[in-house]
Amino acid sequence: MVALINQLQPKTLDWVGTSMGGLIGMVICGQPDLPLPVKVRKLVLNDVGPALEWTAIQRIGQYIGKTGQFDSVQQAADAMWAISSSFGPHTPEQWLALSQAMVKPSGTGYTLHYDPSFAIPFGTATEESTKQGEAMLWALYDNIKAQTLITRGAQSDLLSVATAQAMTLRGPKALLVEFAGVGHAPTFVAPDQAKVVVDFLLGAP
């Protein structure tokens, strides 16, 4: 990711990361000496933090990395919805539109469009290793200087209320916004969710 940012040479840099993308954002923002053309200005951590709930990691590990084979985009969307109801209410049209970016043609059908090796950390993680990693992630978080927003699904099983509240008191002392009726993780399809992020990114430093 550092190599990509250096290749792009952005004039300004904001980071919006959900789940794993948020963890990568914490790693980058928590290391101010990384050779980047610019520092991250604003950071959005979507339903993720330094401490993650083990039961949620186990749940995600049960399906992540399985690419599947589908006859149509709609069939793929239906399969993803079956394991994604925690994303909160979506109309069928919204979910289909969201799903289209997640599939790719494969032979005569479709498969999920991501690297299955993404699942390796979930497959090798243990409750003990997850706890051990928390200290490192908290150290990175405490070192973040970017203005930070945490968005959390009020029913999230990955980012606990206690962790989210602790993140508002230490490190960058993030702003916390929760969305009712949503678990892990908000998709920002709903206008009220998108507005929170847009207002944060476009607002005054």
Where are these regions (language model features)?
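Internal catalytic or translocation cores that form aromatic/hydrophobic pockets or channels
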Residues: 4, 46-86
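Conserved alpha/beta-hydrolase catalytic His-Asp/Glu region
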Residues: 67, 71-124
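C-terminal alpha-helix
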Residues: 4, 196-204
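Conserved serine/cysteine hydrolase catalytic core
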Residues: 104-169, 178
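Catalytic histidine-centered segment of alpha/beta-hydrolase-like enzymes
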Residues: 182-192
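Alpha/beta-hydrolase active-site loop
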Residues: 1-7
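Active-site acidic short loop of glycosyltransferases
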Residues: 9-11, 145-146, 173
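Conserved hydrolase catalytic core segment
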Residues: 7-54
